[in-house]
Amino acid sequence: MTAPGPILVINPNSNEVVTSGLRDALGNYPPSPAIECVTLNDGPFGIQSQRDSDAVVLPLLSLIESRPDASAYIIACY
């Protein structure tokens, strides 16, 4: 049996500070499965409007399609 892929936690904006905060918040969980926090580099710096939300859809889908190794995807947006 193969090991499960990582849980991919996606920050849908391009603000690396937010992604760093996610890593810090999730860093105390057990190591398996791995939790990998990534930034959507093609996203807006912040998501403050419907236009910003709409702008992340295609880059987000592209990122997910490029990571079939992941066991799960979490879109970390509030």
Where are these regions (language model features)?
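N-terminal glycine-rich anion-binding loop in soluble enzyme alpha/beta folds
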Residues: 2-59
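Glycine/small-residue-rich loop that forms an oxyanion/phosphate-binding "nest" at active or ligand-binding sites
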Residues: 54-78
